[in-house]
Amino acid sequence: MFRPAAREVVKLPVRYFSCKSEPTRAAPVTKKTSREEIAGLIPAFPEIYPDFLQSPVWNRRNALKEELERQDMLERRMNIDIPEFYVGSIVAVTSSDKNLGSKEHRFVGICIRREKEGLLHQFTLRNTIENIGVEVVYDLYNPTIKKIETLKLEKRLDNDLSYLVDALPEYSTFDFHMEPQAHPAGTPIPVNECKVKLKTPPWTRRWEVASVRGIEDTWTQATPWFKRKLHKTIVNDYEKYDLIADYRTSSTKEQEVFVQKQMQKFEKERHAAGLTRRRILKSAAAYK
């Protein structure tokens, strides 16, 4: 019986690669943790602490400058209790004044603006006294401020209530002896959806073309001359869709988390040293 000759097996040289020949396995997909799920952090941090945000001007952001300012701001907050308040909240500020007999002055009004960052942060209170609108601008970290009280904690439809200058006086009139209203802990901050009525023109700004929600029927009250001029007015209503501009002018989530952790560390160090028991990072809506 014929049998075929056995074939000789020739071993070829094997090339050893520096990497594994088998394909790498894909990394497991991790669920993104939202700010609400991060333990101890406040979801509404940009609204409660706008003074700790980065500058909206990209070229003015300096990490070292922001770090030094935050240290001074935290030390100042250890000496004075700065409560939570928003644009639209009714706030009372007691400041020292050497020219008065009592050596201090107390002003009550609605917060219409919060602007600037860091140690330069300012907020404006407005009230009507004897049918005259009075606005007082306070530096939040001014050492002459002795006490800040939130008499009524609430929000408005807009983040800037400058249109109260042209509104009827009844929308910015508050009693100086107003009693503070307690806000239940853990409940959302109420939003006052009141829409103000403006005085007859002329106004300080063209509110009929401004993107504000807190004014009632500005087009009807506008003068015919401005209505005819509307087709020549440049309205940049497309800016709200510009994602790149919003990214450059707003603070990132990573920066907010970093600042909050730094504030928590500062609190723990002061509490461990027994210097104070005051809390800096707090929120009426997130507290349980």
From Swiss-Prot:
Any single biological process term in GO: translation
Places the protein is found: Mitochondrion
Organism: Caenorhabditis elegans
Gene Ontology CC: mitochondrial large ribosomal subunit
Pfam families: Ribosomal_L19 (PF01245)
Name of this protein: Large ribosomal subunit protein bL19m
Coiled coil: none
InterPro entries listed in its UniProt record: Ribosomal_bL19, Ribosomal_bL19_sf, Translation_prot_SH3-like_sf
